[in-house]
């Protein structure tokens, strides 16, 4: 892999991903940064590719960050979250019930059915299920978990699983549904949720979402230039605003990792990533 061009990996969860990275590629070229990207069908393939030295930077989901951090620890390497979006910070997930539901407290979910998104979705599955577990309800034991496992490997970036979970709730096939709070608003705007038909039962603690991940050994000058160009972007600049809108942000921020505590707890509870971590770590030997 050439160290003259910064090579980024991203997951193709939606056709707009090509528009986004073609746009950023053109912008970076105007700023003198040689940049290219590779699209992957799933985050596990992307994480493995980064540890195989095939990309310098990965645009990672929160679960892919946890995977990368743990593989790095297992192999004596260092992973760093260098940049994230303003919209990646301080998010919450919610557990929603129908307005006429007899469920008025988390404890009332015992013996009932909870619909979630994809099994690997931090926001629609792992974090809310861990939250319910911390409230004394063991998922799969104290209540039935109904998975809507759309596009595994995309870590819930494709929100179809959350949308299907809400529809199951509204049809009476589930007693509660889990989703990121922003999608509750989106589903209302789409007409999936009619006004007054649902209410929020509980809200998780805040957590963070995606970040750009680099490993030790990445070309420092290129990474620093990439980071500086991102952090210098202004939403007031009409040449870059459409790309920021597509990527869902108004400002890039320096990366931080304290916002992944809730997901780390969920991963520890469910043991979700350990087989993959061991597999990639072994391949690095």
Task: Indicate residue ranges for each PLM-predicted region.
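Short, glycine-/small- and polar/acidic-enriched structural segments
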Residues: 2-103
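Flexible hinge/capping segments at coil-to-helix
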Residues: 97-114, 118-119, 135, 139-141
């Amino acid at each position: 892999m050439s160290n003259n061009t910064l090579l980024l990996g991203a997951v193709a969860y939606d056709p707009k991903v090509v528009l986004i990275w073609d746009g950023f590629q053109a912008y970076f070229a105007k700023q003198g940064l040689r940049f290219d990207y590779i699209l992957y069908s799933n985050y596990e393939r992307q994480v493995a590719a980064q540890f195989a030295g095939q990309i310098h930077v990965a645009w990672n989901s929160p679960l892919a960050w946890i995977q990368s951090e743990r593989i790095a620890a297992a192999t004596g390497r260092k992973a760093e979250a260098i940049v994230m979006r303003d919209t990646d910070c301080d998010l919450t997930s919610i557990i929603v019930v129908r307005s006429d539901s007899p469920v008025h407290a988390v404890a009332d979910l015992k013996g009932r059915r909870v619909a979630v998104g994809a099994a690997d979705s931090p926001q629609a599955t792992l974090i809310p299920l861990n939250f319910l577990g911390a409230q004394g309800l063991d998922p799969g034991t104290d209540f039935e978990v109904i998975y809507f496992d759309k596009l595994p490997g995309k870590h819930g970036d494709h929100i179809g699983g959350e949308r299907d979970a809400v529809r199951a709730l509204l049809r009476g096939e589930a007693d509660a549904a889990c989703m990121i709070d922003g999608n509750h608003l989106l589903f209302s705007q789409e007409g999936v949720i009619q006004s007054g038909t649902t209410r929020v039962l509980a809200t998780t603690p805040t957590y963070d979402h995606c970040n750009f991940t680099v490993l030790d050994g990445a070309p420092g000058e290129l990474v620093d230039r990439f980071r500086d160009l991102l952090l210098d972007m202004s939403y007031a600049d009409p040449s870059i605003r459409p790309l920021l809108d597509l990527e869902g942000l108004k400002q890039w921020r320096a990366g931080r990792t304290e916002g992944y505590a809730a997901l780390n707890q969920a991963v520890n509870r469910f043991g979700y990533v350990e087989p993959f971590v061991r597999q990639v770590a072994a391949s690095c030997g």
